[in-house]
């Protein structure tokens, strides 16, 4: 067998290589994997970590995905929908406080009222976030489930800036049996993996940056399944990846299957992040909030293993308890103003820095679409200080206090 250090120097990996790396468990081997992935990240993507301010628009959902705490048939959840003013207000706050982009997430709905509601929000967010720092307005990621192509196109037009428009829709598992386990409740509406892939094709045709991902540690999942997931990422030619550990939900109907031992699940999730970074290289990878549900510093460790995106929760505190896809979701009692400050400190502790006022589009997307010019990254200390100073000032120019101690 090839020495691990030699394997980690490769630029191409066989399926056997991937399975071997995913299965690493000893502290020494995992440290070597982490170092290789961290180096790959900073060499290819730079040292910045990009924020996607998460706005959990609504927990009303028409789907019955069996793993999910806000599934339609969970009648213990108090349903809510933020108002248009609340959603736009949070997006404007994000733009004024240095966030380059926001993510609107909600349960899946395809009714005309919801589609029009999101359309109005997108138009207003674009119009109300254009500024000197963000001349195209704040970047937008949507995570609103499977939709028709006409809906994707309507939302793309409403966004005002397709170049900085993203859509996140995870296929959860490339194994049809596992996908069925997660999404098909007896006698209920059924999800179809092929239709999910059709949505991906429509999204690209409409000009979105495509984001997808999987659950890690699904009951019955194998390392070979995860390897096939990685190969599917390549085949789909995705721009960003959001994946995290499978965590049971008391609101779902799979809780009797349990979940992996937390320590083992954490390491497998980190290994998956690292291997995806080594294999795909130039995509954006999010450090999932679910990692923090296992360990308080889970997202920071995810950054060490190859992630370069985090999603601070900007949802008003009063809504957070109603949007729990899994048990023990962190930060339920925090307000949006606490998240950015806290995360910047955590990111700095791992030798990285926040990309304030930057869209943070992946290098893969820019290459795929022929955009040779990379988003401007200030090189001198003076330029960096000037950019940070802009991010530190709120709408009336008052200075916000952040923790900025990363060496440059």
Which role does the model predict for each range below?
Residues 52-55, 75, 103-115, 247-257, ...:
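Glycine-rich, proline-tolerant flexible connector loops at the mouths of alpha/beta enzymes
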Residues 142-149, 215-230, 289-296:
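Active-site glycine- and acidic-residue-rich loops that bind
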């Amino acid at each position: 067998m090839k020495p691990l250090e030699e394997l980690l120097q490769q630029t191409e990996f066989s399926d056997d290589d991937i399975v071997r790396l995913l299965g690493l468990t000893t502290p020494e081997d995992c440290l070597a994997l982490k170092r290789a992935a961290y180096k790959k990240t900073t060499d290819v993507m730079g040292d910045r970590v990009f924020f996607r301010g998460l706005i959990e628009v609504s927990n009303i959902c028409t789907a019955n995905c069996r793993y999910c705490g806000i599934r339609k048939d969970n009648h213990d959840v108090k349903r809510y929908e933020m108002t248009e003013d609340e959603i736009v207000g949070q997006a404007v706050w994000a733009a004024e406080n240095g966030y380059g982009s926001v993510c609107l997430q909600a349960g899946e709905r395809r009714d005309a009222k919801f589609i029009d509601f999101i359309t109005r929000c997108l138009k207003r967010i674009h119009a109300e976030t254009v500024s000197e720092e963000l001349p195209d307005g704040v970047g937008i990621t949507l995570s609103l489930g499977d939709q028709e192509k006409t809906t994707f196109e309507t939302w793309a037009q409403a966004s005002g800036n397709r170049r900085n428009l993203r859509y996140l829709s995870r296929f959860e598992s490339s194994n049809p049996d596992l996908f069925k386990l997660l999404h098909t409740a007896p006698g209920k509406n059924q999800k179809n993996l092929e239709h999910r892939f059709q949505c991906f094709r429509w999204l690209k045709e409409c000009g979105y940056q495509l984001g997808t991902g999987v659950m890690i540690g699904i009951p019955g999942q194998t390392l070979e399944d995860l390897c096939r997931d990685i190969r599917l990422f390549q085949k789909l030619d995705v721009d960003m990846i959001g994946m995290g550990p499978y965590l049971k939900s008391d609101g779902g109907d799979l809780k009797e299957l349990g979940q992996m031992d937390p320590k083992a699940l954490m390491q497998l999730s980190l290994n998956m992040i690292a291997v995806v970074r080594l294999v795909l290289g130039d995509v954006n990878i999010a450090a999932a909030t679910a990692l923090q549900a296992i360990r308080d510093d889970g997202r920071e460790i995810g950054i060490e293993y190859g992630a370069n995106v985090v999603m601070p929760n900007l949802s008003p505190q009063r809504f957070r308890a109603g949007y729990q896809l899994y048990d023990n979701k962190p930060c339920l009692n925090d307000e949006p103003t606490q998240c950015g400050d806290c995360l910047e400190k955590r990111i700095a502790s791992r030798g990285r820095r926040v990309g304030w006022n930057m869209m943070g589009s992946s290098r893969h997307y820019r290459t795929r679409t022929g955009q040779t010019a990379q988003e401007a990254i200030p090189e001198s200390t003076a330029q960096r200080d000037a950019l940070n100073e802009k991010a530190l000032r709120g709408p009336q120019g008052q200075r916000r206090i952040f923790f900025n101690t990363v060496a440059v």
